[in-house]
Amino acid sequence: MPRRTDLHHVLVIGSGPIVIGQACEFDYSGTQACRVLRAEGLQVSLVNSNPATIMTDPEFADHTYVEPITPAFVERVIAQQAERGNKIDALLATLGGQTALNTAVALYESGVLEKYGVELIGADFDAIQRGEDRQRFKDIVAKAGGESARSRVCFTMAEVRETVAELGLPVVVRPSFTMGGLGSGIAYSTDEVDRMAGAGLAASPSANVLIEESIYGWKEFELELMRDGHDNVVVVCSIENVDPMGVHTGDSVTVAPAMTLTDREYQRMRDLGIAILREVGVDTGGCNIQFAVNPRDGRLIVIEMNPRVSRSSALASKATGFPIAKIAAKLAIGYTLDEIVNDITGETPACFEPTLDYVVVKAPRFAFEKFPGADPTLTTTMKSVGEAMSLGRNFVEALGKVMRSLETTRAGFWTAPDPDGGIEEALTRLRTPAEGRLYDIELALRLGATVERVAEASGVDPWFIAQINELVNLRNELVAAPVLNAELLRRAKHSGLSDHQIASLRPELAGEAGVRSLRVRLGIHPVYKTVDTCAAEFEAQTPYHYSSYELDPAAETEVAPQTERPKVLILGSGPNRIGQGIEFDYSCVHAATTLSQAGFETVMVNCNPETVSTDYDTADRLYFEPLTFEDVLEVYHAEMESGSGGPGVAGVIVQLGGQTPLGLAHRLADAGVPIVGTPPEAIDLAEDRGAFGDLLSAAGLPAPKYGTATTFAQARRIAEEIGYPVLVRPSYVLGGRGMEIVYDEETLQGYITRATQLSPEHPVLVDRFLEDAVEIDVDALCDGAEVYIGGIMEHIEEAGIHSGDSACALPPVTLGRSDIAKVRKATEAIAHGIGVVGLLNVQYALKDDVLYVLEANPRASRTVPFVSKATAVPLAKACARIMLGATIAQLRAEGLLAVTGDGAHAARNAPIAVKEAVLPFHRFRRADGAAIDSLLGPEMKSTGEVMGIDRDFGSAFAKSQTAAYGSLPAQGTVFVSVANRDKRSLVFPVKRLADLGFRVLATEGTAEMLRRNGIPCDDVRKHFEPAQPGRPTMSAVDAIRAGEVNMVINTPYGNSGPRIDGYEIRSAAVAGNIPCITTVQGASAAVQGIEAGIRGDIGVRSLQELHRVIGGVER
C-alpha cells in the first residue's frame, strides 16, 4: 500500500548522549529516518540533546531541538508546534534506543500524546509493552510455542528472596526497560542477590526486576527481523556470539551469519522469531530477538526482545548492506516491504532477504585503563565503549582484521609478549570472561592444550576454537619454513594475518616493511569485494567494499573504474573509545558531503559499524577496513589502480579522524601518499614540546614552565625547579591518557615508572600545574594566510580537569574584550607558526591576567560539532574545502563562513550554549561490588556529551545537566565537604542554596566555617570517624545511602587530606544516582542552574530559529 496520506508532521526522538550501551548507532539510524521522512514530503521535528550527531545538523529536520530528552521537554516541543498551528501527527520513537522508547511510553501513559492527538508509529504502545515488559513477553513466548528461562518478575526485595529460594543459585537479575544490561548481573550468593536486585529495582523505570534461572555458558544467538502492515516478514540477519551467555552481547565478539547452527536449529529459531514478532504486534518496523541454546542438549530458549532498532540492528545493516533504519522509517509511514526498492541493487525489493557470501566479525573496545579499581570481569552489564567490524571471505580472515581494527596495544596474535605462566594459567584466566580472552585461547592452544580443554574452560564453541587452532598450525608452518614462498605467504594473508604479524615470526625480513616488499615483489595484493545483499546475484549500484586475499592469484578486484573527478581519501576514526568518539566521525561525514558537492570523488575508509561515515551512501565509495598503515596503503593502491585516465587521488585527509589517522600521516607520506591540509612536519612541530616551546618563545607567548624527562632523577629535578604541584604526562596521546597531577616526590616516582612503560619511545613531560586558572578552548581555521576563529569556549571547571570532561560555555561568560583580543592574537601566531592548513584547536589557561598556552592540536577537535551547532558555522565542511585549496575569503563569498567577522565575538542577543560531558561511573564496580570514584582529573573519562542552549547561562546549564544526568534538585538537602583551599570560594554558592530553601549538611570543619558565615547547617560525621557521645550518629555516607541527600558538593583533598573519605562520599553518590559536584566552579554553575529551574521559565527553541537569531550561515 502507498504511504499514509493522513501523516504530515512526524516527531523523531533521538537517543541523546553517547553512553555505554547506547552509542552512535542511533545517530546512524536517526539520520537515515530523517532523510527518508523528508524525502517523502513529510515535515520533521527532531529532539536530541547530543550536538555531536549528524542528525542534529539543521538540514536533516525542519525543526531541530537540541534539548533534553525528557517527557517534560518533549511535551514542550509538541505544545510549541501545536501553538504555532503546526500540529505534530505522529511520534517515531523506535530509532532512538531505549531513551526514546522510555520517553514515548511516559508521554503515552501521562496522556500527553492523546491530549495533542499524536500517534505512536513504528511500534504502538501495546507492542512496546509486550516486548519490553518481562512477564508479558514471557507469556507471549509461551503462546508462540517457545520456551523462556524459568523466572519471576519481582517488585520488592521480599519477592526477590522468595524467587531465589525457588530457583536456586546462581540466578540472573534483569531490570525492565533499561539498556546495555544496566543493573543486571549473575548472582552467586544471597549478598550478591541483594546488591544486584536493589540496584536493578532502582535502575528500572517500572521498578521491577526479573529473577531467572542462570543459563550461564549457553550459546547465544540473535535474529534481526522486519515486518510490515501486510504481515510480510524478513529475517535480515542471524548473529552468533562467540562468548557464551553470561557476557553481555555488546561485550562479546559476534559473527554474522551464525556459524554453528544446524539448518534445522536455524529454521526452528527463525519460525519462533517470526511467531513472536507477530504476537508482540510490531507490524511496521524492525526488532531484535535474542536466543540461547544449551550446547549439551540443544534446548532453545528465548532471552529477550527489543521492539525497536537496536545496537545489533546497526551491525546487521552494515554487515548485510540492508538499511534497517531507513526501511523501518518507510514501514512506519505505511509502505510495505515489497514496495521499497533495495538501494544497493537498485532493482530488488526489500522483501528479498539478504544473502551473505562473506563472514562478518564484530569485536568490542574497552576502556578499563581509564577506571583504576574497576572490575574488568565481563558480565551481563555492558562495559565496552565502542566496537569495530570487519568482513572477510572466511572467519579467520575477518577475525584477524577486526583484532587489528581495535587499535589496542595488541594488533592481533603474536604482536605483544605473552603473559607469564603456562597452559594451566591460561586456562584459569579463560574461566573468567575478560577483555582479550581470544589471546588466551590462542596461547593455551599454542602451549599444547586441546580444543576440548579450551572449549570447556572458556565456554566458547569448539568450532571457533578449532578455527584459532588452525592459525596456531599456520604459525608453526611460518616459523619452520626455510623460505617464505608465495604459496605460504598468500595462505597467511588469506587467513587474516597482517604484515606486522608475519614479520614477528620471520625476523630475517626486517620488520613489516620487509614483508610488504616481499609481497609486492610476489604480486600479492588484496582484491576488493562488494557488499551487495545478494551474493553477487544482482549488480551492486553502491560501491561498498572490503578486502580479501584470495588463494587464486587471478582473482579480480571489484572496485569500479575511476571517474573524471579527482579522488580524496578520508580516514575515519575507527572504534569509539574514550577520547576519540563520534565527534571525529562528524567531521569526516561533513568532509565527505561537502567535497562531493565541490566536485571531488570521496572515498571513506573506516571500520566502525555504528557510525554515519560507514553508511553506504555517505561517501561516493566506502572501504570497511582497519585503519592501519598496511590496510590504508592497500586501499590507496586499489584506488590508484582502478581504471585509467582521470586525475587520480588528489590526497588523503588525516586531520579529521582524531589521533588514529594522524598517527599514520608520516608513514603514509614517506610511502608517497599525498597528505592534504596541514603537513605531517607541522603536526610533529605541534607535538614536539621543544620545537613548540621555541615557537611560543619567538612569538612572545607565555607557557607553563616545563621539562622533558626519561628518568626519575630528571623528572625530580624539573619538579623541584618549577615547584609542585606538577602535571605529568606521556607525549603523543589523546584523551589525556596517562596524565596525572602530582603533589609530591613519592607520587612522581611511581608515575614515572608507569608512564615510561606506557609510551617507551617518547619522554615524559613535566609541566607546572596552574591551580585556579580559567581554561579556554579555541577552534580556528587557517588557510595558510588568514585565520578564522570558529569559537572561544570557557571551561566551567578550572584547569586540571581534562577538557573533554569539563563543561564549557560559548560564548565565554566571564572573559573580557581584552582577554578575547589576547586569545585571537595568540591563536593567529600559533596557526602561522605551525603552518596550519585546515583546523586548529588551542587550549589556554588564564591566571592573574596572563594567558598561558597549554597545547595546540593542528586537527579537528572533539568540540567542532558543538561549536558548529552553537555558532551556525559548519567548521568541518570549511576545513575540508580549505585542505583541498579553498581560501577563507572564497568560503566567505560562498556563504559557508560568515561574510564579516568570525566566532570570536558573539552577537549581542546570541544565546549561551553549554556543553556538558557524560560520564559512565555508574557502569563500573570494583570487584567487591562498590562503586568507583567519580573524581575528575587530567585523564579523560567521559563517553559523550550534551548541549544546553538558552538565552542565559543558568538556563543553558540547567538544560545541560538535565540532558546529561537528570534535573538538578529544586529543593531538599545538599551535603558539602570540601578541601581547605576551597572553603572560602564555596561560601557564596552554599549560602545561595540555603536562601533557596535547601537544608545544608556538612562535616565538622566545613560546617564550622559555614556557620561562621551565617549559613545554617547540620553536622554529620566523617565516614571513618567513630561515633562518639555528643557527636552526630549519622555519617555523611550513611545520609547519602539512606536517600536523605539530593546533591553532593565534594572537592578532593589532593595529597593533603583524607582522600579515602572523599572516595566513599563520591562513590555513594554515584551508586545512588545523586548529582555529585567535585569542583568549586561546578558548584557555582549548579546554583545558577537551580535558580533557573526554580524560576520555571526555561523554554524550547529550534536550532533553525536560534541560528536566525545568531545571524549565522545557512547550510
From Swiss-Prot:
Question: Subunit composition?
Answer: Composed of two chains; the small (or glutamine) chain promotes the hydrolysis of glutamine to ammonia, which is used by the large (or ammonia) chain to synthesize carbamoyl phosphate. Tetramer of heterodimers (alpha,beta)4.
Q: Where does ATP 1 bind?
A: 134, 174, 180-181, 213, 215, 220, 246-248, 290, 304
**Lineage of source species:** Bacteria, Bacillati, Actinomycetota, Actinomycetes, Mycobacteriales
User: Catalysed reaction per UniProt?
Assistant: hydrogencarbonate + L-glutamine + 2 ATP + H2O = carbamoyl phosphate + L-glutamate + 2 ADP + phosphate + 2 H(+)
Binding residues annotated for Mg(2+) 3, in chain numbering = 843, 855
Its biological function? Large subunit of the glutamine-dependent carbamoyl phosphate synthetase (CPSase). CPSase catalyzes the formation of carbamoyl phosphate from the ammonia moiety of glutamine, carbonate, and phosphate donated by ATP, constituting the first step of 2 biosynthetic pathways, one leading to arginine and/or urea and the other to pyrimidine nucleotides.
Identify the cofactor(s): Mg(2+); Mn(2+)
Pathway assignment reads: Amino-acid biosynthesis; L-arginine biosynthesis; carbamoyl phosphate from bicarbonate: step 1/1; Pyrimidine metabolism; UMP biosynthesis via de novo pathway; (S)-dihydroorotate from bicarbonate: step 1/3
**What are the binding positions for Mg(2+) 1 in this chain?**
290, 304
Cofactor, free-text remark? Binds 4 Mg(2+) or Mn(2+) ions per subunit.
According to the record, the residues making up region (Carboxyphosphate synthetic domain) are: 1-407
First-tier enzyme category under EC: ligase
Q: Which UniProt keywords apply?
A: Amino-acid biosynthesis, Arginine biosynthesis, ATP-binding, Ligase, Magnesium, Manganese, Metal-binding, Nucleotide-binding, Pyrimidine biosynthesis, Repeat
Chain's gene name? carB
Q: Which domain of life is it from?
A: Bacteria
Q: Name one Pfam family in it.
A: MGS
Residues that hold Mg(2+) 4 according to the record: 855, 857
Has UniProt tagged this entry with the keyword Ribosomal protein? no
Disulfide-linked positions: none
Instruction: Name the chain's protein.
Output: Carbamoyl phosphate synthase large chain
